[in-house]
Amino acid sequence: MDLNTILIIVGIVALVALIVHGLWSNRREKSKYFDKANKFDRTSLTSRSHTQEEMVQPNNISPNTYVENGHTPIPQPTTEKLPSEAELIDYRQSDKSVDDIKISIPNTQPIYDMGNHRSEPIQPTQPQYDMPTANNVASMTLEQLEAQSQNVGFNGINSSSPELRVQLAELSHEEHQVDYNLSFNEPKAETTAHPKQTTGYIQLYLIPKSSEEFNGAKLVQALENLGFILGKDEMYHRHLDLSVASPVLFSVANLEQPGTFNAYNLAEFNTIGIVLFMQLPSPGNNLANLRMMMRAAHTLAEDLQGVILTEEQEIFDANAEQAYLARV
């Protein structure tokens, strides 16, 4: 038999011995652990109970012990008898059901019962007092208050207070005072604020001043100078980043039906007017977008010699502009 075979056999035998030794050690440790867990250490229980008894402060003080000069009582601690080992509770034999445990307070009835049945908690009763209402007290005179203050059941108001007398005098004066002021139908200023518009459209119309129609070539040139791009639904749109991929802020439509611009005949068509409109809510800030649409309308009106009208077809002046801005 060669050396390699001998070494292999020796290694296998050593490995088997290690495994057997490990299993035997593990079983021995486990058996020791369970033996210790099943034992009841009465010595530790007795020492722990004695320690708790020693920590108790003496409560009984003899009232008959005095200092001769100061007549001050001297507390005399009384030693309490410690229970003997025979009186200790055997916890292994005192396993009681939780249902039999009751919590009670000395000199009172047991309130809490840990049993299966649940008793309703006792609601504390509060004394009720018959106090006069505020309206009755306010309507009383000084004589009535003084007469009622003598009543045993009413002691909540001090009629001698100067502040109360002043208030009652003012109240009595207001009740007997006659209002001679005549009310006239005077116009009242409207203070109700209009609600902000959050949906729908805001529109501005642009029509020519003198001529009957706008020239198509000039109109297209003016729109492209302001960054409008002909796109969806054959209308001109003002995008956020001046690119088709960005959101639309507001748009321009043709007043003539169907409201579109012919992409193949832009240089030869004429129109009676255009409409600028913004849909709410708009991308970003509605107020900033509305101001931008107003500036575009003013620029187009200057370039095309046109007039701006409101949605009610009235002149778009400074007052109308403020009303538009107040809507958003």
From Swiss-Prot:
Family that this chain belongs to: Belongs to the ZipA family.
SMART domains per UniProt: ZipA_C
Keyword Cell inner membrane on entry: yes
Protein name, entry field: Cell division protein ZipA
Function: Essential cell division protein that stabilizes the FtsZ protofilaments by cross-linking them and that serves as a cytoplasmic membrane anchor for the Z ring. Also required for the recruitment to the septal ring of downstream cell division proteins.
Organism: Haemophilus influenzae (strain ATCC 51907 / DSM 11121 / KW20 / Rd)
NCBIfam families cross-referenced by the UniProt entry: septum_zipA (TIGR02205)
Entry's Gene Ontology cellular component terms: cell division site; plasma membrane
Pfam hit, one: ZipA_C
Membrane-crossing segments per the record: 5-25
Keyword flag Glycoprotein: no
Quaternary structure note: Interacts with FtsZ via their C-terminal domains.
GO biological process, one term: division septum assembly
